[in-house]
A protein has these predicted regions:
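A short, GP-enriched loop/loop-strand-helix hinge that lies immediately N-terminal to
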Residues: 1-14, 26-37
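Conserved anion/nucleotide-ligand pocket segment
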Residues: 53-72
């Protein structure tokens, strides 16, 4: 079978599990985040932000439409809080994460669970309108360049991402969560 077991696919549907993996493998890459299971805790965390400079990530699969970014998908802390509260009520937990500035890109790899073959790097256009405006589409389109890189990336960036994907597979399979198929790595290139 080409594709992970349902346990192996946990990295796709559990943002908490995915963040735990990043924390173990590349703590320097982790974005400050809070895994919230209680409404009082949610209020406390949201009140720590001066404005809407945070991201709300519901737990579970959302078809590419669940993550909401402050200043783009919601305006102001209160609107972000209301969305996070609805996520919390739906699944029992929600992740609040600092908003970062950078360019998002995707590195996918085909894997047999041990070896990987990296596909050309892509840049997604997940919003309906230009300039990242409008509702999320869940993956309306993407682009790549003939050299497999994007203008804002170096080969060393891809090498680092590939290593992280390979290390992620080792960790998933060490946890007895069998993974083969296509693993999707979502990354941000920031100034630092």
């Amino acid at each position: 079978t080409f594709g992970p077991t349902s346990k192996g696919a946990k990295i796709e549907w559990s943002k908490t599990y995915a963040l735990d993996i990043v924390e173990k493998l590349a703590p320097e890459m982790i974005i400050k985040n809070y895994n919230i299971t209680d409404e009082n805790e949610l209020k406390d965390i949201i009140n720590r932000y001066e404005d809407d400079s945070f991201v709300v990530k519901p737990e579970g699969l959302t078809g590419g439409k669940g993550v909401k970014v402050g200043g783009i998908h919601f305006k102001g802390k209160e609107e972000g809080y209301e969305y996070a509260k609805s996520c919390l009520e739906g699944s029992g937990n929600v992740i609040i994460q600092d908003k970062i500035e950078g360019r998002e890109f995707t590195v996918m790899a085909l894997t047999d669970g041990e070896n990987i073959v990296v596909t050309p790097t892509t840049f997604d256009y997940p919003y309906r309108f230009d300039e990242d405006k409008g509702p999320g589409t869940g993956g309306m389109g993407c682009l790549s360049f003939e050299n497999g890189l994007l203008p804002f990336l170096e080969q060393s960036d891809i090498d680092e991402c590939s290593k992280l994907i390979k290390d992620t597979l080792k960790l998933i399979n060490k946890d007895s969560l069998e993974f083969n198929g296509v693993i999707y790595g979502g990354f941000f290139k920031t100034k630092n």
